[in-house]
Each structure stands twice: as C-alpha cells, then as structure tokens.
Design a protein with these regions (language model features):
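N-terminal helicase ATP-binding lobe
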Residues: 1-811
Length: 811
C-alpha cells in the first residue's frame, strides 16, 4: 500500500478559515460546547473518515486523516460527556480496548441490544486480562506465523513487545541458543525480571562470563551488544536474535570511528549470520519508519509488520521562555495561542502535575540543576506525611552513600533525579521505588535512564534534549502505558490523552542551541528515519565521510570474513583496543611487534604499567589517534590513580570510598588541583601538550574546597565516572592483553573482580556488586545461594528474608 499521510489535505483545512477557526475554537479554547458545536465537529470527523476510506480503496493510506478524526471524536466526547460516537468509531476501526472500557465504565446512556452484541464480539480479542486492538491481534499473528528469517515488529511503546518476544520464543522451543540484545544495562535488569517469570527451561545469562561452553547447552542471553559479541567469541552460535530498540542500529557518529555501538550491533548480526545460516532475527522498535532501513548492506530483506494505529492521543502544550502558553495541533501543524501569560514556569509545572511526572533533560548537569530548582518550588511536606518506605530509603541512602547526598532531601518532597553518572546500583534500587511508590511523584531523568524502561509515567515535562524526532517519539510513548490506561483499577478513560508539556527555559537550552518550537513541529506526520550507520543498505553518507565509511566497511567485512583466522587488526578490533586507539597501518606494525616481544609473565601490580608501555609509550601522532579519555593512560599519574581506585573498588564500601576521596581532595587545598570528570560535569579545560580542545572536562577544586555539600556530591559522580572508565576503556585494553596472551584469565579476573576464586567469580558474574558480595560473604550468606539444573541462581528463604531486611545496606 502506498503511503501518503494526508498532510496536504489537512494543510488545506488549515488554510480555510471558515473551517479551521471553529475547529480551533471548539477543540482548544471553549471548555464547554453545545450539542450543535458537537455536531459540527462530528461532521468534520466524518468528512475526514470518508476521505480516508476513499483513499484506502485506491491503495493509499492517508493515516493522519483517520488519526485526526479519532482526535476530534474523542475530544468532543469528553467535552459533551456523550461517548456514543467514540464507541461507534472504536467498534468500526478496531479500537476495541476503548469500546470495552466505555462499556465497563457504563458511559453509554442508552445501552441497547446492538451494544450488547458488539461488546460480546470483542471477547475474541481478549488476551489474558487485556483486550487487543484489531490491528494488534492481526500483526501479532502475522509475526508469529512469518516463516522468514528476518522479521520486524514495529509498534508504539506498550503495544506488547515483551509479550511477543516470549510468545515467539515459545513457538521456537526447539532452538537452544537464544539472545535478546538490549541497549542498556538498566534494560537488562528489566527484561531479566520478566524472563525469570516466563522462562523455566533455560539458563538465563546477563553477562558473557556467566556462560560455560562445556555446561550450558540451552540458554537465553539478555545482554548488550558488547556482551553478546563476547559470547560469540566464546563460541555461542545463536539460533534466534531479538534486537530490542532496533532503531539504535541507525545511529552513527563519524567522530567516534569504530567506537560506535551501532557498529558493534551490526557486527553481532553479521557474525551470527555467518555462524548460523538458519539464524532467525526479530527486530523490535516503536520508532522505525521502514523496516528496510534496518537492512545490512548486501544481505537479507526484513519483513515489515507494523501497528500504525495508536489509541493514545497527544495533548501538546508549549510554554516558551517569555511565558506565552500555546497548544500544538500536530495534524494542522499549527501553534494555537492560549491567550494566557504564565508568570512562573515552575508554578505552571506544579499546577499541571499529576501522579507520576517525568521531567526530561538530556544533560546530567541540567538534571541536577533543574531538580534543585524544582525542589525549592515544591511545597513542604511534614515528616508524618512521608511514606514509611521512603523514610526507610532516605535512611538507607544516608548510611550507604552519604548524609550529604542531595537526592536524600529531595526524596522528602517526592522528587527523584537520576542520570548515568550516579552509581549504577543506587540507580537500579531507586528505580524500584519510582515504579512502586505513589509518594514519589516527580522524576527527573534523561534517556540513559529511560531507554526501553517501563515506568508508570502519566505526565511529561520536556525541558531540553537532542534534535532527533525519533527519540522524542520514543520518549512520549513512555507516558500512560496501555496496561495502565485500560487496567481495571483505572476508573476513567481520560488517560488516552497524553499530556506533553514542552517548557522552554533559557538556563536549560536544547542541544547545540536548537529550537524547541521546531522540535515540536517534527511531531507532525510519520517518523523519518535518519540512517547514518555506513553498514546499512540505505545509509546516507556525506562526501566528507566517504573515505572513513569505506575504511569502516572494509574493516568490518574483514572481521566477518576472516573470523576463524583473523589477522592482527581484526583481533585488535574485536578485542576492543582499536576502537579506542585507532592505530594507523604503521602503528599496527609497531604494536604487533611489541606484542610479539612481550610474552614474558608480568606481575598483577604491573598490568596497568604494561598497558601504558604497550599501547602508548613512544608512539607518534602519525601512529595512532586515541580518544582523549583513553589517552590519559599515557600519564603515570593516571596509572597510579587507577591502580589505587581499583584496589579500593574491590575492598571498600561506597560510603568509605566517598569519604576517602573527599578527605584526599581536602588535602590538596594548597595546590592547583584539577580532577577529570568528563564533559557532563566539567567546568574548566586543561590544556596540555596532548590536549588543546575546548571541552570542559575538569573541575578546579580550589573553586569549591569550602563547599562540603558540593564536594561530597561531586565525589559520588567522580566515583561512577571512574568505575565506568574501568568497566569500558581499561577493561577493553585488558581484554586485548588477554586476547594476545600477555596476561592470563586468572590475572584478568583478579584485576576486574579482586579474586580468581571460581566460586566467587560465578556469583559476581550474576551482576551482584562487589559491595553486596562482600556483605553476603561477611554474614555467611553465600551458602544460601544455589543453582538449578540449568545454572540459574536461586535463593533459599533465609537469603530472601536477609535481603528484604537489609535492602540497599548491603552495598
């Protein structure tokens, strides 16, 4: 079917004042309307439906026309409290959850035999405790019946992606090696929790080092692409790959060269295909325009199964920096003046707040600054009004992190902020409360936290972000999940309207000073794919990037084609060093020779020194072009710092490490001491012979040495920045040393885990933090951890009681 979204028709309506003006007046400005007004709006909707139907018969899908008709009918129904037209529309166009909800809530004033009969026909669209739309049921069946080996499920957020994965898995029980690939560690945790409930006959693997080639014959892996690639290196030949959030494949930044995660995801698919010609692939995304845009160069086509009709209706408002409040009609493509002036942005935010409000900003620094201002504006809450579970959380965080951790006081007003520079274990623990606690009503976060996450959000305040409309659609889809809208506990239908408030604040600008108004305008019409990954068939490559693209394609092809007999560059790329250091051909020759000459055993405490010597010493600028963050390892001071950091990471609690770091900083009061924190929280640049950029990546401690609150909260961030650095940059370089037999597996384990005990490592690889493991070991709880026949961890009743009692205090 041809796609013509109907934008031109709607633009013609906008340009005819005799139609446009009453539509705008009745939909956006008049709170109460008459029956005559309603008749006019319904007549407009019928004309749109008629035009849509005529075009469908011609094979043209003008989807915006039917969407606008639905918007008009639903809005009118609520204004006049008469739901007959909405019920009839829902029955005729397969919006069955709405029709059933109208019946369940007794919203039809003149229920008759026809309503009873149509309601009974909806029963065949029941799926457990929910009702599917006509299109939803149809597409589910198409995906499950598709005999092709590359299939896509493209549907709005909350339309049953997780259920489809596990239904598809049930239909393929004969397959032994299954992988679900997700973009973030937080999403690993979420999918793992779902899998534990539904999968009982496989080993569930969330880390590549959980896998044993000799023991594990039936597995379900839930990993990022990095971990999945390491599983392939360990010999896993996947039978099925589920690519969650598949739109991530489209991304690419040529400044990062081989260090692009989309490249690794594409490599995983290509290697898995090479290992198993019968590989089944299921791509899942809420924000892909065409499935063909996911296709890798010179390879198989991907069938397109799409749910295009969304039950949720966007109510978009825009408060600009001057205080002008406007509404945006995404069908007419027009901002409509509310004729209201808002004196305070935060007063508006508080006034428009609901039960669970998401405040979105893209930079961690902005998140913390905004959260501080919001906290100051929120009304005071008496201690006796704070829920007991939140009081417990406050107490735990004060003990385990630090009493000066500013999130603690924010919790007392029902406010949480999270970003990727906060300790991972704390993030996951606090997210549990965001999901479960009604007291926590304000959640300030960015996409690092939200990617793919299911949270009970019912209101969105969008403050600042990137220009990508795909990410914006994905974010909006997180608000009011279908399961929440149509649950038995929800006594209203009005949650089909999704409140999206765009708030323009000068102190929290858009990425690259972009226009928030123009970003809103991108919500009109279909999603347009921006295909930047050079490995994809439909990639758009600028002339300035063509040589880089050719080199990347050649490198990736070589990795796949020579996988069993890789050359030096392929081994270096697969193990991780090349994506960080970008050696030239001359540099590769030097490095290869060094590796050949360094086969003698090295002591554990010399490993980081060896990293410096092998990868950095005596290389010239024309030999390599390392990323700045990894280039810091050429300095002996950095090496010594991370040796000490890793020792403390393996031996001390988070609370101890925070106190020690602040104590150390205070000892530097007489010197010009700057610490590296990266671009998210950096305040100054430090020019050296190796770095002359303008990025603010350092903090000058002399500017803050008398501000203890600042120091302790900076320490929390700094420790996570360094832990990420160890987990990524340093671990990739160590993985390369392991690949070339310069260190052995036991040395690698001692460095990363602080132990080479197989029993301890088996437990640490489950994703348990070092702090939790130390606490379990100290209290003799390790004996209460068991493994089932497939190797899945099980806790007995004693351990479950212990965990419930201690909570986050184990960290």
């Amino acid at each position: 079917m041809m796609t013509n979204d109907g934008k031109r028709t709607l633009t013609r309506i906008k340009n005819q004042d005799n139609i446009r003006n009453p539509i705008v007046e009745l939909l956006y400005k008049k709170i109460e309307i008459t029956n005559k007004d309603a008749e006019f709006l319904y007549s407009v909707a019928l004309l749109l439906i008629d035009e849509y139907s005529k075009e469908i018969e011609k094979g043209i899908d003008k989807n915006l026309l039917i969407e606008y008709a639905y918007f008009i009918i639903a809005t009118t129904a609520f204004k006049v409290s008469d739901f007959r037209a909405l019920y009839d529309f829902s029955i005729n166009y397969g919006y069955y959850p709405i029709a059933r909800k109208i019946i369940d809530l007794d919203l039809l004033s003149d229920m008759n035999i026809n309503h009873v009969m149509t309601n009974s026909r909806i029963d065949k669209f029941e799926d457990g405790d929910k009702i599917l739309t006509y299109q939803q049921k149809k597409v589910f069946e198409e995906v499950l019946d598709d005999k092709g080996n590359a299939v896509s499920f493209l549907a709005p957020t909350s339309y049953g992606k997780s259920e489809l994965i596990f239904d598809h898995l049930s239909k393929n029980e004969d397959k032994n090696y299954i992988g679900i690939v997700v973009p973030t560690k937080a999403l690993i945790d979420q999918v793992y929790r779902e899998a534990k409930k539904k999968v009982k006959d496989r080993k569930l693997i969330i880390h590549d080092q959980n896998y044993s080639k000799s023991e594990d014959k039936r597995i379900l892996t839930i990993t990022t692409q990095e971990r999945a690639l390491r599983l392939v290196d360990e010999g896993v030949k996947f039978d099925i790959l589920y690519i969650d959030e598949a739109h991530e494949m489209l991304n690419f930044d040529y400044r990062n060269n081989l260090n692009n995660r989309s490249l690794l995801l594409t490599r995983l698919i290509k290697l898995s295909r090479a290992a198993n010609q019968n590989l089944l692939e299921l791509y899942l995304s809420p924000v892909i325009g065409k499935a063909s845009n996911l296709e890798i160069r010179n390879s198989k086509t991907i069938s397109d199964h799409r749910i295009s009709k969304d039950l949720k209706i966007l109510n978009i408002s825009f408060l600009n920096s001057e205080g002008n409040l406007k509404y945006y009609d995404r069908y007419l493509g027009e901002f409509i003046d509310s004729e209201k002036m808002i004196r305070s942005h935060f007063d508006y935010i508080i006034e428009q707040s609901k039960n669970k409000n998401l405040h979105f900003l893209y930079r961690p620094r902005y998140i913390e600054g905004y959260a501080k201002l919001l906290y100051e504006k929120l009304p005071f809450i008496e201690e006796y009004e704070i829920d007991s579970d939140i009081k417990k959380l406050i107490s735990e965080l004060a003990e385990i992190v630090h009493p000066k951790f500013k999130l603690i006081k924010y919790l007392s007003k029902g406010l949480v902020y999270l970003h990727g520079k906060m300790p991972l274990i704390i993030r996951n623990y606090v997210l549990k409360y965001v999901r479960e606690s009604r007291f926590l009503s304000h959640f300030v976060a960015n996409s690092v936290i939200l990617a793919g996450m299911n949270l009970p959000i019912d209101n969105l305040f969008y403050i600042s972000g990137y220009s990508n409309s795909r990410d914006l659609y994905n974010l909006i889809g997180r608000v009011n999940r279908l399961s929440d809208i149509f649950s038995k506990e929800n006594p209203s239908l009005n949650r089909i309207f999704i409140p999206v408030h765009f708030i323009e604040m000068d102190r929290f600008p858009q990425n690259q000073q972009g226009s928030l108004a123009k970003k809103i305008e991108k919500l009109r019409g279909r999603i347009k794919d921006e295909i930047k990954n050079p490995l994809l068939e439909n990639s758009t490559i600028a002339t300035t990037n063509s040589l880089k693209a050719e080199e990347i394609i050649e490198t990736e092809d070589n990795i796949v084609n020579s996988y069993l007999t890789p050359d030096f560059k392929s081994r270096l790329t697969r193990s991780g060093a090349q994506q960080l250091l970008n050696y030239t051909e001359q540099g590769l020759q030097k490095l290869s020779q060094r590796f050949e000459e360094n086969q003698n055993y090295i002591q554990d405490d010399e490993i980081l020194i060896k990293v410096k010597e092998l990868f950095f010493d005596n290389f010239e600028d024309f030999d390599f072009s390392p990323n700045y963050s990894v280039d810091r390892l050429k300095n002996i001071a950095t090496i010594n710092y991370y040796k000490n950091f890793i020792y403390n990471l393996n031996t001390k609690s988070l609370h101890e490490r925070i106190n020690n770091l602040v104590f150390f900083w205070k000892s530097k009061t007489d010197s010009d001491y700057q610490i590296y924190v990266g671009t998210q929280f950096g305040e100054v640049t430090r020019k050296t012979e190796n770095y002359i950029g303008q990025n603010l990546v350092y903090v000058d401690l002399s500017d803050h040495i008398n501000d203890e609150d600042y120091l302790y909260n900076l320490a929390i961030i700094k420790l996570q920045v360094d832990e990420d650095y160890v987990s990524y940059e340093i671990t990739l370089l160590l993985n390369t040393l392991l690949e070339f037999d310069i260190i052995n597996q036991k040395q690698f384990d001692r460095f990363i885990y602080g132990t080479d005990s197989n029993e301890e490592i088996k437990i640490l690889r489950l994703g348990i933090s070092r702090g939790i493991y130390r606490k379990l070991k100290q209290d003799d709880m390790i004996k209460n951890i068991h493994f089932d026949d497939y190797g899945n961890v099980k806790a007995n009743s004693l351990l479950i009681s212990y965990v419930n009692e201690h909570g986050v205090r184990m960290i």
